[in-house]
Amino acid sequence: LLINCARGPIVDSAALAAALNEGRLAGAGVDVFNQEPPIPDSEPLLRARNALLTPHIAFASQESMIRRARIVFQNIESYLAGKPENVCQY
């Protein structure tokens, strides 16, 4: 089983699709592609067996949204208290 939710080019899509179609790999979960959105005629994973594909939304769980909101509120509170966090120096 292979899961890629990092970056599309990390995995060779054609090789992964071949491994899935030939039964050398049991399954794959893919949330990222070489081309976003994937082009149907040129993305072999769209036709591969045992591939679970999502449209680059692996980050969008309820837990991650709640955590992100908490971080935003903490950053606003810190800024208003005169103690900004994660300051970018340019």
Regions found by a protein language model. Give the residues of each.
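Short glycine-centered segments of the SAM/dcSAM-binding site in methyltransferase folds
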Residues: 1
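Rossmann-like dinucleotide-binding domain for NAD(H)/NADP(H)
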Residues: 5-90
